[in-house]
Amino acid sequence: MPPDPRLEAAVDKILDRTGEEILSGLGESRKEAAEALAGSAKTLEREYDRIVEEGRKEADKIHRKIVGSADLEARNKQILLLETAIDRVLEKVLASISAERGPGYPDMIKSLIGEATATLGTTQVVVRAGSRDKDVVQASLGGFPGAELAQEPIECLGGVKVSSKDGSMTLDNTIDARFDRMKPLIRKEIVSKFGIGI
């Protein structure tokens, strides 16, 4: 069935209208994510320091081996080991984040839904959440007329996935997706602390 030109025009109009809002929302989301992470900073800071120390030891070991070897193949293997160590660090950080369900978590869920509805340009949405978050999400939907909670839970550490009711647009605002979007920046920061170029 050929695409409906009216639907395409409507989607284009929505995308044009909300372009700046999306960019602004992304900036706000980044700020909110930073604030949410700062809220659990003490716990995460201790874990972060321990993980960074483990990573530093692993990176120092890798760095000494790279400096001692002129063989490019050996260096590439060492970089692969560093990537593995970084992946372990990221997994531990993600596990720490997923375990957090502090008093600010319901506000974060409401903010994620608000960001998604603003980005999609409608509150007529279907919100999907993990089984752990269904009650929190359901309680947050009162502020979004026309929004409804999907019955089937999704596999995620937290957050929400929001779709327009017709399914044409979706915003993945799960902790998993947000973390995946931040991984390259986190990876770059960790690598730069050890002075190893990848």
UniProtKB/Swiss-Prot annotation:
Sorted UniProt keywords: ATP synthesis, Cell membrane, Hydrogen ion transport, Ion transport, Membrane, Transport
InterPro entries reported in the protein's UniProt record: ATPase_E_C (IPR038495), ATPase_V1_Esu (IPR002842)
GO biological processes: proton motive force-driven plasma membrane ATP synthesis
Membrane topology according to the record: Peripheral membrane protein
GO CC, alphabetical: plasma membrane; proton-transporting two-sector ATPase complex, catalytic domain
GO MF annotation terms: ATP binding; proton-transporting ATP synthase activity, rotational mechanism; proton-transporting ATPase activity, rotational mechanism
UniProt entry tagged with the keyword Protease: no
Places the protein is found: Cell membrane
Stored HAMAP family: ATP_synth_E_arch
Role according to the record: Component of the A-type ATP synthase that produces ATP from ADP in the presence of a proton gradient across the membrane.
Family the entry assigns: Belongs to the V-ATPase E subunit family.
Subunit and partners: Has multiple subunits with at least A(3), B(3), C, D, E, F, H, I and proteolipid K(x).
Protein name listed in UniProt: A-type ATP synthase subunit E
Origin species: Cenarchaeum symbiosum (strain A)
